[in-house]
Design a protein with these regions (language model features):
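P-loop NTP-binding core
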Residues: 1-164
Length: 164
C-alpha cells in the first residue's frame, strides 16, 4: 500500500478537496483506496456521508491501543474511509503522554497493507502531533499551496526547512 499524506499548516488551501479527488479518482481507476480523515472539521467524512455516532473514528486510532484501522473502516462511493472526529482537536494533549505518540497512526494501519493499493490521509491545518503522525505513516507528502507570493516565498520554504 502506498500512503500519501495531504498536509499544509494553513487552512483553505484545498487539502480535503484534493484528498477526496485523489481517493475517488484512484477508486474509479479500480484501485483499492482508503481515505483517512484526520481533520477535526470532518469535511471528508461529511462529504462521504458517514455517520460517526457510536463508531470507531480516527481519534480512537490516535489515542488508544484498543483499535486498529480495520475497526474504523467504512465504505462510501469513493472507496473506504476511516472517519474523522471533532475530538481530534483534543488528540494532541491525549497523545502527548504516550511513548508512541508519533507512530500511533502508522501502528494502527499495520495489517491493512495487503487490503489497499493506496491510503490517502487528509491532514488538519497544523503541523502538530496529528499531522506528524500522518507524515510518519506516509510514503509521500503532497503540500497543496495557493500560488501567491506569501505561500511560495514563506510557507513552502519554512515547511521544507522544518520537515524537508
Amino acid at each position: 500500500m502506498k500512503t500519501i499524506a495531504i498536509c499544509n499548516h494553513k487552512g483553505g488551501v484545498g487539502k480535503t478537496a484534493l484528498s477526496m479527488a485523489i481517493a475517488e479518482g484512484l477508486h474509479r481507476k479500480g484501485k483499492r483506496t482508503l481515505l483517512v480523515d484526520l481533520d477535526q472539521q470532518m469535511n471528508a467524512t461529511q462529504q462521504a456521508k458517514i455517520d460517526t455516532t457510536d463508531e470507531v473514528t480516527v481519534y480512537d486510532l490516535l489515542t488508544s491501543f484498543d483499535y486498529t484501522a480495520k475497526d474504523g473502516i467504512k465504505h462510501f462511493d469513493g472507496g473506504d474511509i476511516i472517519p474523522g472526529d471533532v475530538l481530534v482537536s483534543n488528540a494532541e494533549s491525549d497523545m502527548a503522554k504516550l511513548d508512541t505518540r508519533l507512530t500511533m497512526l502508522a501502528d494502527a494501519m499495520e495489517g491493512i497493507d495487503d487490503d489497499y493499493d493506496y491510503a490517502i490521509i487528509d491532514c488538519p491545518p497544523s503541523l502538530g502531533l496529528v499531522t506528524r503522525n500522518a507524515m510518519v505513516a506516509a510514503d509521500e507528502l503532497i503540500v497543496p499551496v495557493i500560488p501567491n507570493r506569501s505561500s511560495l516565498c514563506h510557507h513552502v520554504p519554512s515547511t521544507w526547512r522544518r520537515f524537508g
